[in-house]
Amino acid sequence: MLLAIDVGNTNIVLGIFAGHELKCHWRVASDRQKTADEYGLILRQLAHYQGLDLKEIQGVVLASVVPTLTQVLTEMITKQLGHQPLVIGPGVKTGMPIRFENPREVGADRIVNGVAVYELYGGPAIVVDFGTATTFDAISEKGEYLGGAIAPGIGIATDALFARAAKLPRVELVRPPRLIGKNTVACMQAGIMYGFIGQVEGIITRMQAEMGGKAIVVATGGLAGLIGPEVNCIDRVDPMLTLEGLRIVYERNT
């Protein structure tokens, strides 16, 4: 079995693959204060509840945008599983040409998403990853990573509105029943949700035009299930796209 780990600023997503099949996955908070031993305990508890034997894990692949957690999790994997993880970064074979001014600047998760979307859906394609930040990544018809855009995530926008407007309460991030709100909370939810949707649709539409025509648009990330269905120009919602990309890259390096 293969353990795939996607380390983000807010959450860590772990998945267990048996061949090409994703057997199970978990989402835990990204906590920079936790030690390797604490993360090891979490992994063992999750595996126990799932009825999995960690001794069956034959390889580990990891993509991270949090350097401190990369070190902690690498130590945890070495101690708990006896494996050296494949950490996505320079020198790792992805099979995807990077048409970026400085390829080392591209986040590991964005590269992995690009690999996955081209392998699973073909190109040209656009990946929208709804996480702490919202990233848009363009993949050519030939499978080249072309670049993209980075915008604040909807959670950041919500926190900023609450923090900077003294009389506005903190609200739950949910789809409002209508655009025209009838109370302060509903008005905030409508403005946050539909303002964000408009931003996403605008960036996708302009990106497609810059790419010369129609590109398949795939949404992923922790908030893809909430926001993806509301965006008219998103074709597919695939919350496990990053884990699939990690599996694909691992296979290309073994």
UniProtKB/Swiss-Prot annotation:
GO CC annotation terms, alphabetical: cytoplasm
List of residues binding ATP: D6, V7, G8, N9, T10, N11, I12, V13, T132
Associated pathway: Cofactor biosynthesis; coenzyme A biosynthesis; CoA from (R)-pantothenate: step 1/5
Cofactor(s) the protein needs: NH4(+); K(+)
Entry-linked InterPro entries: ATPase_NBD (IPR043129), Type_III_PanK (IPR004619)
Reaction catalysed by this enzyme: (R)-pantothenate + ATP = (R)-4'-phosphopantothenate + ADP + H(+)
Catalytic class of the enzyme: transferase
Known EC number: 2.7.1.33
Quaternary assembly: Homodimer.
PANTHER family the record matches: TYPE III PANTOTHENATE KINASE
Family named by the database record: Belongs to the type III pantothenate kinase family.
Protein known as: Type III pantothenate kinase
Gene of this entry: coaX
